[in-house]
Every structure is written in structure tokens, then in C-alpha cells.
Amino acid sequence: MSTIARRGFHYMQRLNSANVSPALLEKAQNRVIDAALTFIRERAKFKGELMRSLGGVAATSSLLGVPLGHHSSFHEGSAFAPPRIREAIWCDSTNSTTEEGKNLRDPRVITNVGDVPIEEIRDCGVDDKRLANVISESVKLVMDEDPLRPLVLGGDHSISFPVVRAVSEKLGGAVDILHFDAHPDLYHDFEGNYYSHASPFARIMEGGYARRLVQVGIRSITNDVREQVKKYGVETHEMRTLSRDRPILENLKLGEGVKGVYVSIDVDSLDPSIAPGVSHHEPGGLLFRDILNILQNLQGDIVGGDVVEYNPQRDTYDGITALVAAKLVRELAAKMSK
């Protein structure tokens, strides 16, 4: 069991040993969750009203942080990522214009809702199933406010399941997913954890929340997971076939006949020489330009996305991976907004 998971588990043990009334605990959990959702609701409402008053925008990328790291099977520092990524987005080392010419100083391109208070919710003894529901509800609150679209900052990759579920349920149907990662994240469960960061896309596919799942950068895959790939009809593009697959990947057309496209970027999809600040180093990965070429050429309406698995605790002293993650967010935000 991970350090952060143990902390939550031991806290619940202390509550149980203190004979805390289940009714009292449930009431406390409900109040804290209501307060958390009220915060997200009011922040999203304000940002939505602001975008509508400015006018001339059909979609605004809305940053929602989900600082959750306890479902990681190794290092857990991704829980500390959202504020570091936000800081790097506005770092003075670069200007505010994206490669496609959008000015991030224009709030109609990118805005910020804030973070779901994951640690505070878990501190009340809320279990993983209910926590996932809180994440889903938070995403829906953002989507309630047209023209906001969720661009979620992880956190480990487990967050993609409740986020994609929310997007699909809110839009009333499945989406297509473009997924950059070193790992397929398709385990049915990992070491008994149904909500592991190694399992989100199994949850998504079995729930019918995605029609197509296109994975890019895969280079660590077990035979059991290959069976999962076959089971769910996943389109997996491994690093060993990247040269052959590049023409296909740089001309992707997704989202037709479904509710749009969701883009999930695990920072460990990149080679660790480019992005060392991740929990799981897997040599032989994508170059930064590989991701941008695929993303910038993607045809389809992007209705949501996430950038996950940046781990500040494993980054270099000057935060190079934070800058890498921030640029991924910047360029994805530019692609989403219109």
C-alpha cells in the first residue's frame, strides 16, 4: 500500500478505534463534499458568466486541478503537480502566445476554476468510489457553464476515469479518446485496486464511455494487457512501430458520430531525457515534437482533456518537467478553445 494510501487508511483506523458514530461521520463527509462542490460550482459559474459577457467564444479551456496521487503504484508526488503546472504556464521564460498563435492572456482561451480539495475530502474518510463521484460531479459543474470545457491537471492517471465518465454522461454519449502514454493503463485492476492509475481505461471502455481509444507511445505492456487491448478493440501504437505509424497518427480524424474527442496526455509518454519528473521512468519514449505534431494535426472537436503524472518530487532543480507539462497544457488549451 502506498504512503498516501496508508495515511488515509490509518486515519480511518483511528476513527474506527475511537468509536466515532457512523452517522456522525457520514454527516461530516456530506458537509465537506457539499462545500467542495459549492466551491467548484461558484468558481465555474463566475468564469462562465465572464466568458459569456466577453462574447465571441464557442469553447474556453477551463483548468480544473485534481491533486490525487494515492492510486500511483510507485512514487506519489503527482498530487503536488497542479499548482506547479499553473505556475509554469505563466513563467516569464516564455511568452503568452501558443504555437498556433493564440494569446493565453485572453481569458477566452484559457481560464482557471481551481482544485478539487482531494486531501481534505479523504481526510474525512471518504472512500475511493465516492471520491471518484466527487471528481465526476466537479467536471460536470464546469461543463454546466457554457462555454467552459474541462482541461484537467493531475494528479495520477486514475483521474481520467471519473473525468471521462463525467464528460460522456454530460454530453449524452461516448467520445473518442487520444491517449499518449508509456503504458496502456488497461489492467482490470492492479494489485487489487480497481481505481489504480494502471486501470482507468479499462473502467472507461467497460463503461461504454469511449468508442475509440487510440494510444500512442506505448512501450511497457504485459501479455495480459495485450489481451485487454484485444478485448476492448484498442488502437495501440507502440514506440517500436512509431516510424511506420507516423503518417497515420499525424492525420488522425476522431469524434465523428460520437460526442467529440477527449485527449489524455501522460507526461511519461515522453522520453525521460525530456521529462524526468514523472513517477515511472520508461526509456525510449516520444519526443515533445511527436506529441505536438499529432495534436496540432488532429481533426475533431476536443470536448475535454487532461495532463497527468507530472511528479514535482522527481523533477530537476530548475523544474524542466514542469515547463514541459505546462507547454502541453498551453498547446492543448489552444487546440480546445475556439
Swiss-Prot record:
Biological process, per Gene Ontology: arginine catabolic process to ornithine; protein hexamerization; putrescine biosynthetic process from arginine, via agmatine; urea cycle
Pathway: Nitrogen metabolism; urea cycle; L-ornithine and urea from L-arginine: step 1/1; Amine and polyamine biosynthesis; putrescine biosynthesis via agmatine pathway; putrescine from agmatine: step 1/1
Gene Ontology CC: mitochondrion
GO molecular function: agmatinase activity; arginase activity; metal ion binding
Binding site for Mn(2+) 1: H157, D181, D185, D266
Top EC class, one word: hydrolase
Binding residues annotated for Mn(2+) 2, in chain numbering: D181, H183, D266, D268
Subcellular location per the Swiss-Prot or TrEMBL entry: Mitochondrion
InterPro entries, A to Z: Ureohydrolase, Ureohydrolase_dom_sf, Ureohydrolase_Mn_BS
Entry's EC annotation: 3.5.3.1, 3.5.3.11
Cofactor note: Binds 2 manganese ions per subunit.
Role summary: Catalyzes the hydrolysis of L-arginine to urea and L-ornithine. The latter can be utilized in the urea cycle or as a precursor for the synthesis of both polyamines and proline. Possesses agmatinase activity. Catalyzes the formation of putrescine from agmatine.
SUBUNIT field: Forms homohexamers.
Family of this protein: Belongs to the arginase family.
Name recorded for this polypeptide: Arginase, mitochondrial
